[in-house]
């Protein structure tokens, strides 16, 4: 079935592609026939604006006004769009409003800020604190881009003055970084080399120097910029002559030969160089998380909003793009206000789109991490999230709550942790506290100073000290159960009021009694009372709310999830590892709410940011059903491998925690078709595991981390991996590992197929991450961004198209190649294409099950205007599979289990999409419905 020729505002299904210089718009265009054949309506791509040269992801934007030339530029984008439209498809793009890449030598806006300081035309575009408490940074930007202490860089001649003839700019060079010199210093630098004896050259240089010297007396900003442009043009002309360039080179060389003079020059600039480790303590501008090469943007300012979105608005107006996914919306000052403004601007452009591309309401989803029991806000005027909440829901559904206690105790016993650390919350709180104080100390200081300024306005808070505020604020942030609150000048809503109330309650015991009353004050200052037009209150609110989000992200996703290893399939972006499982009733309730509130939100099970591929998680979920099987394998492995655990002064390498998580990762990520005797295949797998482990160890921040890596520990852990997989231990370990995987892999595949079918059939817009149409055993980036073998996928898809009506059951004989997953996905998406209204606007009806296997399946119907779809998937079915070598249930496994259909379906024939059966009756026997294949999709 083909996609409709006319565009629709809401995609039927999306496919995410990661674009970079080795995979461009033209590469994507070459895949469109296969993407369309798979049943995808919209291509969904990583950011397309100009990023740092060589960027592999596009989130490090340096110019939001231009299509990335490394992707082929606007011309290649136009070819892709034309090819999409010819197939009745559309384009969704990822946008990055929160930040831009800085450092290096390519961001013109940032370089202008460094050159001109607060007087820069772009100074207000970045969230810079120009008057921080540190006097050394007044009117300056901290530039923490050095890989060594400042004095070592200066004395080692790694900091040198450099003239760029193309830009007519003098700048300090440090490797690939450029730090522009203020124009007011040009005259002194140019005259610093003395005279040459060549009258004309000396006169020309003096004339150029005079132009720059005159800038100091020009006060009007517009006039100053015009004079600066003229002076730079004069310098460019002067440098174009051999004599002129020689004079400039001489002046530059003179300064480079005098470190003290060079230091004095740098001290006068609007930037202050520092070692990159200084950023966490002293940075005076907002970063993306704790990444010093990504600077926060002030898109809450109307002119910055327009400047950073001009390209997106134009592409939407042209009909080239049909919607957006907003990256890191929680980083913004006012996420709700931003989303509403974006909706209004795109809607205004819709009337100017080509007549055949008008959508009325563009599709907008946000990357928003929702905490447990945190609903998505309904007042943002978006279509929903980008799908991490669904990934969490479906992932938890696949887990069997019965295994939680056994796995929890096993984790404690293995690691020697106390019972107090049994729950993930303890690990998360410890990580939050460390991340806040070690990685966001500067941001915590800034928020505390902003709140202190508010306190000084109030007579009854006259004696509240900055240090007391800092202590109380830190505990409030640590105990906040969500990423952030969304108070504005009018105060906070009931949802946030409850969140802050709980955070205050939880924080109280961690403060001295004398500081405890401050928590209530902070609650009032941070949105509990309307800030109105009070700028100090508004600043304090902004600093506080923009602090908690990156702390939560780095502490939970990027620290605690690498420390707490009970069952790694629950350690995922958007998930709470402490919430082990979700029962069928709760899942149905969540899907009914999704149908009611968010019918057009994105549904994801794999992304460019996931920790583990969707089928790794699906396989590991089987361990919740078979914890004894896991321990029967892991405990002997630990004993057998004790000889290769190295003893270092700080303790064992790897630690018990790391060893447990390594074994789970090996079991989960072992490629389905890999033979343990395939030396090359196993070595390639070992390289991937070692890469994962290196990142996991540093993210955990226990024995090593990114700030101060312990290379001896890392090397010992690296050696341990290769000893197990390719070294002395391999001959015994590999067959044992393969046997362990073999016993749970069929059940894992059933979970994977169930997860896929749920994604395609529940309310929302299913997204397919690149390559995940076959088994996805990827790990955290960069592993999940490896090149995809699209040729293999092309061949299997064409073979499927050659037999469109055949049962897919024969594919189970070779299930490890993943063709069964791709075929089921394509068939399911074809039903979405044939019955779009059922999925876009249809009711969600849970269907009851009865019989001995009723607890091991989930079924529901979607209905619209008398058209019906029924989906049936198994749950926790390892016991039903028994010792089956394929993901198919043995005869008699389901015994008397049936699904009860709604009355309108009782006499209506239903076509089984995957095996071609025609079924009819008030009850469907799962022994028949799931007799040939492990999941079923039926339609009227």
At which residue positions do the language-model features occur?
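Hydrophobic or amphipathic alpha-helical targeting/insertion segments
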Residues: 80-128
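Conserved short loop/turn motifs at secondary-structure junctions
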Residues: 98, 326-332, 813-814
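Activation on extended, non-transmembrane soluble regions of large proteins
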Residues: 33, 45, 89, 121-125, ...
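Carbohydrate-interacting/catalytic domains
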Residues: 1-53, 65, 70, 78, ...
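Surface-exposed, active-site-proximal loop segments in enzymatic domains
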Residues: 55-68, 106, 110
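Hydrophobic "anchor" residues on beta-strands that sit immediately upstream
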Residues: 90, 323, 363
């Amino acid at each position: 079935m083909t996609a409709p020729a006319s565009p629709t505002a809401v995609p039927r299904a999306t496919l995410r592609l990661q674009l970079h210089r080795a995979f461009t718009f033209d590469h994507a265009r070459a895949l469109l026939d296969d993407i369309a054949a798979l049943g995808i309506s919209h291509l969904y791509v990583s950011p397309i604006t100009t990023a740092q040269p060589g960027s592999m992801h596009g989130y490090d934007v340096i110019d939001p006004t231009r299509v990335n030339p490394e992707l082929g530029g606007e011309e290649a984008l136009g070819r892709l769009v034309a090819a999409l439209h010819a197939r009745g498809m559309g384009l969704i793009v990822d946008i990055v409003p929160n930040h831009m890449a800085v450092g290096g030598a390519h961001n013109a806006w940032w370089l202008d800020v460094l050159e001109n300081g607060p007087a820069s035309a772009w100074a207000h575009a970045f969230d810079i604190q120009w008057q921080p408490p540190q006097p050394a940074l007044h009117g300056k930007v901290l530039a923490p881009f050095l890989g060594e202490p400042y004095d070592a860089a200066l004395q080692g001649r790694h900091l040198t003055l450099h003239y760029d003839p193309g830009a007519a700019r003098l700048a300090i060079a440090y490797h690939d970084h450029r730090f522009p010199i203020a124009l007011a210093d040009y005259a002194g630098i140019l005259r610093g080399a003395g005279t040459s004896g060549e009258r004309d050259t000396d006169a020309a240089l003096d004339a150029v120097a005079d132009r720059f010297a005159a800038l100091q007396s020009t006060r009007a900003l517009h006039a100053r910029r015009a004079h600066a442009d003229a002076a730079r043009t004069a310098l460019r002309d002067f440098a174009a002559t051999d004599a002129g360039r020689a004079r400039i080179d001489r002046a530059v060389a003179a300064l480079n030969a005098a470190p003290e003079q060079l230091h004095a020059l740098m001290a006068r600039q609007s930037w202050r160089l520092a070692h990159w480790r200084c950023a966490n303590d002293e940075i005076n501008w907002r970063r993306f998380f704790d990444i010093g090469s990504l600077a926060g943007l002030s898109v809450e300012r109307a002119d910055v909003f327009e400047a950073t979105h001009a390209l997106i608005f134009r592409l939407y107006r042209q009909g080239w793009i049909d919607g957006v996914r907003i990256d890191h919306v929680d980083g913004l000052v006012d996420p709700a206000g931003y989303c509403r403004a974006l909706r209004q601007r795109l809607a205004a452009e819709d009337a100017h789109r080509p007549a055949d591309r008008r959508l009325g309401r563009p599709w907008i989803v946000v990357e928003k991490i929702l905490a447990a029991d945190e609903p998505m806000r309904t007042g943002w005027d978006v279509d929903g999230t980008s799908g991490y909440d669904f990934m969490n829901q479906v992932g938890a559904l696949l887990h069997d709550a019965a295994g939680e206690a056994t796995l929890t105790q096993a984790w404690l016993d293995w690691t020697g942790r106390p019972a107090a650390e049994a729950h993930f919350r303890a690990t998360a709180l410890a990580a939050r506290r460390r991340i806040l104080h070690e990685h966001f100390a500067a941001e915590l200081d800034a928020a505390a100073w902003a709140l202190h300024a508010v306190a000084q306005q109030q007579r009854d808070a006259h004696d509240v000290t900055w240090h007391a505020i800092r202590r109380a604020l830190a505990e409030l942030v640590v105990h906040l159960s969500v990423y952030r609150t969304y108070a504005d000048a009018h105060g906070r809503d009931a949802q946030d009021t409850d969140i802050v109330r709980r955070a205050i309650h939880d924080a109280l015991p961690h403060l001295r009694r004398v500081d405890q009353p401050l928590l209530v004050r902070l609650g009032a200052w941070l949105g509990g009372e309307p800030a109105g037009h009070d700028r100090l209150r508004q600043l304090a609110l902004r600093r506080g709310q923009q602090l908690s989000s990156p702390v939560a992200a780095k502490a939970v996703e990027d620290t605690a999830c690498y420390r707490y290893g009970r069952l790694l399939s629950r350690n995922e972006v958007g998930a709470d590892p402490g919430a082990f499982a979700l029962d069928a009733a709760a899942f149905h309730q969540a899907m009914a709410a999704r149908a009611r509130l968010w019918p057009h939100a994105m549904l994801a099970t794999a992304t460019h940011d996931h920790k583990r591929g969707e089928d790794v998680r699906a396989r590991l979920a089987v361990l919740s059903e078979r914890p004894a099987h896991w321990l029967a394998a892991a405990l002997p492995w630990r004993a057998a491998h004790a000889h290769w655990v190295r003893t270092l002064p700080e303790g064992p390498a790897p630690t018990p925690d790391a060893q447990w998580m390594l074994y789970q990762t090996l079991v989960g990520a072992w490629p389905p078709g890999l033979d343990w005797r395939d030396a090359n295949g196993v070595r390639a797998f070992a390289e991937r595991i070692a890469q994962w482990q290196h990142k996991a160890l540093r993210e955990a921040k226990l024995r090593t981390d990114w700030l101060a890596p312990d290379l001896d520990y890392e090397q010992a852990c690296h050696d341990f991996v290769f000893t197990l997989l390719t070294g002395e231990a391999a001959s015994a370990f590999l067959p044992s590992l393969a046997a362990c995987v073999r016993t749970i892999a069929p059940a894992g595949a059933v979970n994977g197929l169930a997860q896929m079918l749920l994604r395609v059939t529940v309310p929302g817009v299913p997204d397919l991450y690149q390559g995940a149409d076959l088994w996805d055993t990827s790990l955290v980036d960069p592993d999940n961004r490896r090149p995809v073998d699209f040729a293999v996928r092309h061949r299997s898809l064409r073979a499927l198209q050659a037999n469109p009506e055949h049962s897919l059951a024969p594919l189970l004989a070779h299930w490890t190649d993943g063709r069964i997953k791709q075929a089921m996905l394509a068939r399911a998406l074809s039903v979405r294409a044939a019955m779009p209204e059922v999925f876009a606007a249809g009711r969600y009806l849970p269907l009851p099950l009865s019989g001995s296997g009723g607890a091991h399946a989930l079924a529901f119907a979607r209905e619209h205007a008398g058209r019906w779809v029924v989906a049936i998937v198994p749950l926790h079915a390892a016991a039903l599979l028994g010792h089956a070598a394929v993901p198919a249930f043995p005869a008699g496994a389901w015994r008397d289990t049936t699904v009860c259909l709604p009355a309108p379906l009782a006499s209506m024939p239903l076509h089984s999409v995957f095996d071609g059966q025609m079924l009819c009756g008030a009850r469907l026997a799962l022994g028949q419905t799931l007799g040939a294949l492990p999941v079923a999709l039926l339609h009227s």
